[in-house]
Amino acid sequence: PTGHYEWVSAPFGLTATPSAFQRLMTFVLRDHIQAGYCVVYIDDVCIFTKTDDPGEHLAKVEAVLASLAEHELLAKGKKCEFFRSEMEFLGFMVSADGVAPVPGKVEAIRQVPPPETVSQLRSFLGMANFFRSHLPAFSEVSAPLTDLLRHTTGGRQRLQWTLECDQAFQLVKDMLTSAPLLRHFDPGLRTAVH
């Protein structure tokens, strides 16, 4: 084969691809992000308005799509959802009311058995950590579980599971399955930092 070849899409397997693509998307959509109506995570783009005016929302969607087209980036129509009042975005349900974990994930959490190995515990804590913004005092509640990891070496090593560990595990599961809806920030309300 002779000639010049170049990628028309991001190649799989290159370790720098996600960070490079994130940087590209942030650059391309910077004006919309700074205007406060667009959120981007790699190839997931969320465009939102604070009013129920479909004309305002359409204008913002068109502006974002124009910015993408200007940089020769395409959005696949079958992967797009338009004019939704509620949607799943990065593992959360986002609506005008706020942000909450996706109900299907909550049900899966209820079914998780107590971990038996270091690897299973790390997996559970990683999943719980993803939702930590919804879990008040998460680090204190999960302390017996994270302390258990300090005394281990390998992923297949069996855990020295105690009653305290079991109570912490059940409490974290309960917190995850009843995680509160996080309201969108309102600068007009009193703000408390804990």
Kindly give the residue locations of the regions a language model identified.
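Retroelement reverse transcriptase polymerase core
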Residues: 1-194
